[in-house]
Amino acid sequence: MFRLTNRLALSNLIKNRKLYYPFALATILAIAITYIFTSLTLNPHLDDLTGADAIKMVLGMGLGIVALSSGIIVLYANSFVMKNRSRELGLYSVLGLEKRHLFSMILKETVIMSFVTLLLGIGVGALFDKLIYAFLQRLIGESTGLVSTFQVMTIPIVLVIFVCIFSLLVLVNGFRLLRLNPLQLTKDGLKGEKKGRFLVIQTFLGLGAMGYGYYLALSVKDPVTAIMSFFLAVLLVILGTYLLFNAGTTVVLQLLKKKKSYYYKPNNMISISNLVFRMKKNAVGLATIAILSSMVLVTLVGAASIYAGKKDYLASSAPHDYSVTGTNVDLTSTRRAIDDFLVQTGNQVNRKVEASYLYFGIKEQEKNKLTIFSENERKVLPKSIFLVFSQSTYKQLTGKDLNLTSNQVGLFTKNKTLKDQKSLSVNSQTYQIHDSLNDFLKGKVPNLFTIIVSDYSYLVVPDMDDFQESIKGTATTQATYVGVNVKDPSHDAKKNSDLLDKITDKETQQLAGQTTGLPKSYFTANSRYDAEGMVNGFVGGTFFIGIFLSIIFMLGTVLVIYYKQISEGYEDRERFVILQKIGLDDLQVKQTIGKQVLTVFFLPLIFAFIHLAFAYHMISLIVRIIGVLNPSLMLVVTIIVCGVFFLAYILVFVLTSRSYRRIVSM
């Protein structure tokens, strides 16, 4: 019996190769991608790249997501394969093979498949390892020398991950065999799914879950809240999608059946009857396609927007080659730190910008009435941020004089409520809004608060001392900024950046009243060289992971669509043969198949685009933390991604439809 199960295992893989080819291809690609991620994460040459810490962190997180996604896809593909082999396994049981023999046979099939796919997957991963490393270097703006070395620990890690996945696969298949008798196995592939119960309740639950998920996505107003709400919104939308596909498709089909003018046409009747026959299975498959498609779109839109927007972020976060920001430090001290740096480096200044301002968070807002946090409420996340400048500083930055009187202010704001106001009250002190200003800090003074809150404002006051007196006792912070562009910024950029860090650290230590921990008064150094390294490393790594996650999600989408078409093709073949015998010609068969396929496979695409539309606001807030501050750019990226995905979906639809028609027409 041992030899018999050996022969059966090998022959079964050969006979069912049409089912196993996509399964094997998906597994090989998943193994190769996991190998590449593991190899890159362990690569010692990452330390030589600018922004190495950011790259390692992103790759480490990506490896976990890739491994989890790979496991889900392999298990899902296996379920389709075993479903289509139910009659075969039932026949073996009827012929005398016991369940332990069937389990032994399936175990050996899995061992053979795992050995072949692991061998090929690791081989493909090793083959493309250097190329992918060069691609990562290109994304983060480094030279593309192929410096990639074989890591001994890469193979054991990949083996552990996929041995666990294949072991789980064996357990799932074994449990499936144990709970079914031979008669059930022979009929399992043919029987239709049972009609769902409590359809009305399911429909309302689905609408409620999806509606609340959409509400969460649209109602968040700052990036931090968006991150905290994102996963809950995703879970609710996934739950709502499955419930609506399961119950909603049933309700719609039953309504169509009641519409006699539509239902009693040969093509419509056959298509609807076939969908009703497999109602529950179609619902789960379609919902899965919709969710996977949404994952592809969200991942690609987010990753591509981050990569496309990195230049804008660099321009706003590091507008100068070298700069020093003083927190609760006067402008003279900040200027002294940058002047000391210029003397030691001998750099010639092309441009110099200086600014002194204060900033605070808003605790409450009632139309144009603002309340600032008190000093003991500093740690509370503000609803919005205000940066306050004197009109003399405004004139230095813009060259324009506002000529404000004692009760007048100039205002630039992202707050929709304040944009239409004629006056502004700050802690009971009322000011007339004399001028509505443009963003006068852009390219001059960095405002890093934009990545924390999308609601921020710049206030220009006639006299800073008077304004500070009016808000005394509140949680405000003074800041000074001095930034310079030098004649040759690329010369000794790293050395100069390190020197500026040392100077600011020394100046910070010399400030009076220092305590352990984060000082109340301190200097912060920034250079475009360091900013580019950090941003390129993080953004390039994020885009790199986004591409590969999108490939995995797309792979899952294609697999589900392909196996769905194949499995339904085999199920429909016998029924269409019967219909042809009772008078349905070939043209009617093709029209009926076409209508069914169109209905089934374009509904998930519509849902995916709807999900993306409602998630767009939340995605835009999340990517703001990474520096995507240009809404127009993100919109263009989204349109391009949707167009490319639509074309890819059409291609998959055309290819899988041919397989379906070929099987049904046999």
Mark where each language-model region is:
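Basic-flanked hydrophobic alpha-helices used for secretion and membrane insertion
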Residues: 313-314, 320-325, 331-555
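Short cytosolic juxtamembrane segments of multi-pass membrane proteins
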Residues: 3-7, 179-193, 570-574, 661-666
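Hydrophobic alpha-helical segments
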Residues: 112-256
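Hydrophobic alpha-helical transmembrane segments of multi-pass inner-membrane transport and secretion
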Residues: 18-45, 53-90, 110-124, 202-204, ...
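Alpha-helical transmembrane segments and their immediate juxtamembrane interface regions
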Residues: 154, 235-254, 312-337, 626-662
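N-terminal Sec/SRP start-transfer signal
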Residues: 1-31, 195-200, 209, 244-293, ...
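Short helix-loop junctions at transmembrane helix boundaries
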Residues: 39-53, 122-155, 211-228, 603-666
